[in-house]
């Protein structure tokens, strides 16, 4: 039948039982079958992203969970499914992915199950890096390059130069990560990697179309830019030529594996003289500043340029309005600058026309403006012309002896005044629609930072990962929870350099200088026909550097790209790195706090939610706060009440379960076990012989985090109730051990149902006064045997006033209410508050009808033994202070509100009569 494993079926069945059809579809799309995800499951998930009631974070978390599988098939299919949803699903999906700190932490993934697993693991690591980069680009740009409009009135063609210089390195970084997949036709051996390759191929066509539009826009405005901007634009153009070679190789693989040739665009090369012209213009700006405006044919400062350069209407291309500048003047001035360029090594590493003199001589007569030429070949990869361009022959770049290696070329830092692009770049028109908000505006406190390193094309990151992109109030700052990601894979621990103060300009030091032999540097004529204009478009594969994307452009500082789109509060980052110590402030108002937001999709009570609560992300679309990590297991949300204390012992005999509750229950004190004290038994003092080892009072309760972490007893926590409660109290009504509320607030289990009042009364007092008296005599008599040993172990200040004359048995009241303080009159000596007396947790204090410690009362020597067991209530043999009463309630703080009954006949008895 199918190749699904039993694990796949069980996982799908589990989600079916829980009712999550989306998660079930994810499991079905990521089975162990060595084939691409089935279309029916992908279509279902795509439809689910368009539904308003579908939880996008849950869908993404299920995909991430499947990507942690040990099998390369499941992981690869999870990546393919995620990519498919990023491309074809609702934009909410990629928005959510962009909001996360980390996506796929697969930089070290390796499936050792077989040789095929080793091979596929390599592509899984590269593929996950590209998906991370794709989401990162969306975060920086607030749009997906593959989704935006392309062509003459597309986004990249109508973008103002300042933004264009910022966006092109980001786009270059995404293309670099895609090209790094670097698969060969003989490696496309199974349906899973084939599905991934098809998605990458389609992405590359769209991304390169955007890339081409951006380069056209740069060339159109090149002669109107300031010097620093021209320098950045020239570097971007050089990198474009390098990437064009690699794109051609990728498309060649697509051709070999059988993709329809009509879907593969034919990339043709631009004339080499175009690069020379651009370099001469830049040299003119740097060497002959007075002739700047005449040489460029347009005013240099963009803020003073004509409105033609800042056309905001998407229906008109800027190129059509820039042609007003006299083109011949541009190149006449450039001709005068020919000696300057001849002294500089040729940047054209891949020039396929070594006969520069002949090429220039033939092209000297018809000199078109470069902007017009760029406009003509600008639609190379437009949506409608992709298929029509297959007939245009492309020059083979393989025969070139100077083809650049993938390693970065020798880079030298040119301290030319490139910082002007960062400091003096002014927005051309204030009415321009700002796609980026203030994303790329340097904050006032930022100093210009050196652009760190032209990285090799093998690196998908736009810059070195050492740059901390998340400094400042970045709402996406990685918190401690994402520290497990490898540095190169922590998706957003990198950003382009702050500004372009010293620009690292990769020069053509690896190529021999080719001096210009002709004084006329005019480019070759660009005809208006489709074939030649396309040839001009894609530009020659003359690459001077294979440096990766974001080095020379004035790059964004710590940026808040989604300031408007996702409405992140800037102060979110302040809470993104809390202390990871396990001591959680349960009652602090800011332990789990974050800026005001909508309802969170998941409970934020877990420890992980505490650590990461500040890194939330507010989606403006449906007004909800999306925490960054949704797979955190909430280990502390619902403590099991059954584990609070062991079941109460209901035997009527006097046998004591010494260790059952002491070591079986997760109570809040590590004190002796509660004792089942029988009113007719003399076994109450079996623990007395253990002395201080069992009786040492604990002043600070040990709180088990797994039980009572999130169910606080606020009264006990804030000191409004005496801290004398123990985890189990003696129930005078039936020899039962009734667990009580610990100071740390552990919940009372269902078994803590108080017995009926009638039974309490009958059992508590015994059948008559004789049995009660016998119980009193028996308990006190046996206690005396070990009283001195216990007294030695006990503090002198812990003594309580007891005695036969002071004991008043009370009839058990019919009802009691929780939290009512005792109404019995406390003796004047007990006026010391429990906090002042500092009674230990196990010590019976005022809540037991006993005065606190240190009140200076006289006391019988055997009484410390009776009350040394910190988890039991005093037996009836113990005398209470006159005016107080024994409480039958589950907690010492919940005393009966009944008034004390009339004087009891036993009140006149003295303990001395029985000794």
Curated annotation (Swiss-Prot):
Gene3D superfamilies: 1.25.40.90, ANTH domain
GO cellular component term, pick one: plasma membrane
One Gene Ontology MF term: clathrin binding
Alphabetic keyword roster: Cell membrane, Coated pit, Glycoprotein, Membrane, Methylation, Phosphoprotein, Protein transport, Transport
PTM note: Thr-310 can be modified by the addition of N-acetylglucosamine which can be further phosphorylated. The form with phosphorylated O-linked N-acetylglucosamine is predominant in brain synaptosomes. There is no evidence for direct Thr-310 phosphorylation.
Basic and acidic residues bias spans: 901-915
Biased composition (Low complexity): 410-425, 500-511, 720-735
GO terms (BP aspect): axonogenesis; chemical synaptic transmission; clathrin coat assembly; clathrin-dependent endocytosis; establishment or maintenance of cell polarity; neuron development; neurotransmitter secretion; positive regulation of axonogenesis
Compositionally biased intervals (Pro residues): 512-522
Positions where Asymmetric dimethylarginine occurs in the chain: 873
Residues with attached carbohydrate: 310
Stated role: Adaptins are components of the adapter complexes which link clathrin to receptors in coated vesicles. Clathrin-associated protein complexes are believed to interact with the cytoplasmic tails of membrane proteins, leading to their selection and concentration. Binding of AP180 to clathrin triskelia induces their assembly into 60-70 nm coats.
The name this protein goes by in its record: Clathrin coat assembly protein AP180
